[in-house]
């Protein structure tokens, strides 16, 4: 479920084509990777999706009436644009951001930004706590195939503000997400949601609904149909 750029760093297109001949089927987690492989002349490709454990990733009890200011969480490192994220944070001093950086060395980008809390590599339960204390999942991406971050964000009922790249529309649509193509788009959409709680709650509700499509049970059904 690597983006094409990551695949091409490791393998030549000739190697990818050759390897595809030794398997019955290649399973991808997003249509953009399927299209990439099809364009290489590889036809034995099945498009599935990234699953989520809806029993563990659940919304907070006060999802629709969280007190205080709107909070935004940023998670994931693969094909993320942290410089652009830092710019967005700097332009929205009234919004608090949880920046889940994992092991990425990006602290210098957020130096002096008092509205950013940098979160290192933490246990899953602690990460879920930050998700449940947030309203919006911000995903500034250069590309994406299938994303654990996207699916868990939706399962915890977060409104999605995302780059319109890769396979993102396999997972989100206009009912639960704001699609962006520039830093100003991200800033504008976060401000719209921060100032319109009714719209924010509508996106949250639809994220929860859409997350059910990506449950482990549905993933098993998807794969079992492939094996028949």
Predicted regions and their residues:
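Membrane-proximal helix-turn-helix segments that form the acceptor-binding/catalytic region
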Residues: 5-26
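Carbohydrate-associated surface elements
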Residues: 32, 51
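Acidic anion/phosphate-binding donor-loop and adjacent secondary structure
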Residues: 38, 52-69, 83, 108, ...
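Conserved catalytic-core segment of nucleotide-activated headgroup transferases in glycan assembly
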Residues: 65-108, 118
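Acidic donor-binding loop of glycosyltransferase active sites
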Residues: 132-145, 158
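Short glycine-rich donor-binding/catalytic loop of glycosyltransferases
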Residues: 142, 158, 162-169, 182
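Conserved acidic donor-binding segment of nucleotide-sugar-dependent glycosyltransferases
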Residues: 174-184, 192-198
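A short, well-ordered alpha-helix in the C-terminal region of glycosyltransferases
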Residues: 192, 199-213, 222-225
């Amino acid at each position: 479920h690597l983006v094409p750029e990551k695949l091409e760093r490791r393998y030549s297109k000739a190697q990818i084509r050759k390897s595809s001949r030794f398997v019955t089927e290649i399973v991808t987690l997003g249509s953009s990777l399927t299209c990439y492989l099809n364009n290489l002349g590889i036809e034995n490709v099945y498009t599935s999706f990234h699953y989520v454990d809806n029993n563990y990733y659940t919304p907070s009890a006060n999802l629709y009436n969280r007190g205080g200011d709107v909070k935004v969480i940023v998670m994931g490192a693969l094909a993320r644009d942290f410089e652009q994220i830092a710019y967005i944070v700097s332009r929205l001093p009234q919004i608090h951001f949880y920046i889940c950086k994992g092991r990425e060395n990006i602290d210098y980008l957020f130096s002096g930004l008092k509205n950013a809390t940098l979160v290192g590599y933490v246990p899953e339960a602690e990460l879920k706590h930050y998700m449940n204390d947030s309203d919006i999942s911000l995903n500034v991406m250069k590309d994406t195939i299938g994303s654990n971050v996207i699916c868990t964000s939706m399962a915890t009922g977060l409104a999605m503000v995302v780059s319109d790249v890769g396979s993102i529309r396999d997972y989100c649509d206009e009912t639960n997400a704001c699609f962006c193509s520039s830093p100003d788009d991200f800033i504008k959409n976060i401000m719209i949601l921060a100032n319109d709680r009714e719209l924010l709650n509508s996106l949250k509700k639809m994220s929860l609904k859409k997350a059910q499509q990506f449950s482990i049970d549905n993933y098993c059904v998807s794969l079992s149909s492939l094996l028949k």
